[in-house]
């Protein structure tokens, strides 16, 4: 077997397996019982699409596809961060939200180490 034949066979198997994974991930997105399940499915879908693009780039020899895969990875990451912020903001109780803003409230600052030492010594 020549190296070209091995590469062709390996890329064919990879395309079949990635296509199957893509199909199963789409089913998980559709049937996902909760919103975080769907967000995780979308993130996995982006990762599988990046793999498909990379295999197609190797198979065709048109390596500009790798740049497209990198851009898709960046967009997928930003989408995941946006969905996470949406889920976090949606889960806050109404009294913790600041009316008229989309900012997520920050936690209260903890006392400094110096303040703790003073309290320990005072006991």
Curated annotation (Swiss-Prot):
Chief site of localization: membrane
Location(s), subcellular: Cell membrane
Keywords: Cell membrane, Membrane, Transmembrane, Transmembrane helix, Transport
InterPro entries per record: MrpF/PhaF-like
Membrane topology: Multi-pass membrane protein
GO cellular component terms attached to this protein's record: plasma membrane
Ranges that cross the membrane: 4-24, 38-58, 64-84
Pfam families from the UniProt entry: MrpF_PhaF (PF04066)
Annotated GO MF terms: sodium:proton antiporter activity
Annotated segments matching region Disordered: 95-123
Family to which this protein belongs: Belongs to the CPA3 antiporters (TC 2.A.63) subunit F family.
Protein name: PhaF2 protein
UniProt source species: Rhizobium meliloti (strain 1021)
